[in-house]
């Protein structure tokens, strides 16, 4: 490492002398434009390779899980090369929804009933053409949980399915109540602390295919919900393993970060309007218990949660809700192998709130922390239209757990 630093300093000095010489030549000759462009390109490449492209930090609670990931999910130990012209957190976060493609995935929709009379929309990708698992009863099943206002149509969900389709697995996307176009039958939506709907979905899917390996993956709020479920239930779950991406570990820290002026302008206010739009669509269902007009005046996610979410789910205060919603406090109780990918520059999930010490105390948990990637960004390649680093981590981990998961118990 010291040798590399010395080489970079020497290269910088030589580059400085070169640029100075070229500028002098350019003033009295020609070609200064090309020389400057070449020089700055070399300088940028040196900076990128030395400061931006880095291997992720792998934090595990046990040596066995660490060795397992190194052997069967090597992407978590390889250098992550963010898109060279867009590696900053906000840039990655903003760009991904617009630049990544949306692969065609043919879903089969199913509406299931809940105990309170509501309904949940599930979108299935059965993968009936699977050459590896032709018997549907034993075909591995992966449950996907989208983010705060997301559905099965999100590009990151589509890419997770598309990239892994060749593995032959079956996928089912859990759409939260009222967001996927279905009618809201009861005055209740969703939040990341109440796991009742997720428990209903997991029970339903497992009852359909009890002999099939069953895994789950959650993105952003979907990951928070999944971790809260796993922390509550411990090892008594039909899930074999799980993965989360861009989880907000401490809801208070997330809210504080998103309320900073620039983050509020770029992300917070927009997401608040998305939440309000969903409420307004089903306004007639809430008028008896919620002051909807007051909710529609909220200017931040925190204000929305104070006026709507915390009230709907019976919390005395917004602080009570945010405490219960934070998955960091339940991580120690997770009883199955879980891989959690976060970027330390994610403004939705500040690095200081990532529970590194707690993860070290649970042999079932692995944190994969990249230096860059933003929130559900993880763009890579010159023109990042296709799969991301997150998609590759998902594919390798799911495949590792389904094909080699038995090795963990023997390590």
Swiss-Prot record:
Catalysed reactions, as listed in the record: a 1,2-diacyl-sn-glycero-3-phosphocholine + H2O = a 1-acyl-sn-glycero-3-phosphocholine + a fatty acid + H(+); a 1,2-diacyl-sn-glycero-3-phosphocholine + H2O = a 2-acyl-sn-glycero-3-phosphocholine + a fatty acid + H(+); 1-tetradecanoyl-2-(9Z,12Z-octadecadienoyl)-sn-glycero-3-phosphocholine + H2O = 2-(9Z,12Z-octadecadienoyl)-sn-glycero-3-phosphocholine + tetradecanoate + H(+); 1-tetradecanoyl-2-(9Z,12Z-octadecadienoyl)-sn-glycero-3-phosphocholine + H2O = 1-tetradecanoyl-sn-glycero-3-phosphocholine + (9Z,12Z)-octadecadienoate + H(+)
Active site (record annotation) = 220 (charge relay system), 346 (charge relay system), 375 (charge relay system)
What does the UniProt keyword field contain? Hydrolase, Lipid metabolism, Membrane, Phospholipid metabolism, Serine esterase, Signal-anchor, Transmembrane, Transmembrane helix
Chain ranges of the AB hydrolase-1 domain: 140-247
What PROSITE patterns does the record tag this protein with? UPF0017
Q: Name one GO cellular component term.
A: membrane
| Gene3D superfamilies per the UniProt record, alphabetical | alpha/beta hydrolase (3.40.50.1820)
Q: Membrane-spanning regions, if any?
A: 25-45
Alphabetized GO MF terms: acetylesterase activity; monoacylglycerol lipase activity; phospholipase A1 activity; phospholipase A2 activity
Where is the protein found, in the record's own terms? Membrane
Can you tell which superkingdom this protein's organism belongs to?
Eukaryota
Kindly indicate whether the keyword Transcription regulation belongs to this entry.
no
An example Gene Ontology biological process = medium-chain fatty acid biosynthetic process
Question: InterPro entries attached here?
Answer: AB_hydrolase_1, AB_hydrolase_4_CS, AB_hydrolase_4_sf, AB_hydrolase_fold, ABHD4
User: What's the top EC group for this one?
Assistant: hydrolase
Sorted alphabetically, which Pfam families does this protein's record hold? Abhydrolase_1
In the bilayer, the protein is annotated as: Single-pass type II membrane protein
Name the EC number(s). 3.1.1.32, 3.1.1.4
Q: What does this protein do?
A: Phospholipase that may play a role in phospholipids remodeling. May selectively cleave myristate (C14)-containing phosphatidylcholines through its predominant phospholipase 1 activity, cleaving preferentially acyl groups in sn1 position. In parallel, may have a minor phospholipase 2 activity acting on acyl groups in position sn2. In addition to (C14)-containing phosphatidylcholines, may also act on other medium-chain-containing and oxidatively truncated phospholipids.
Write out the similarity annotation. Answer: Belongs to the AB hydrolase superfamily. AB hydrolase 4 family.
The protein's name is Phospholipase ABHD3
Q: From which organism does this entry originate?
A: Bos taurus
Lineage runs: Eukaryota, Metazoa, Chordata, Craniata, Vertebrata
Which gene is transcribed and translated to give this protein?
A: ABHD3
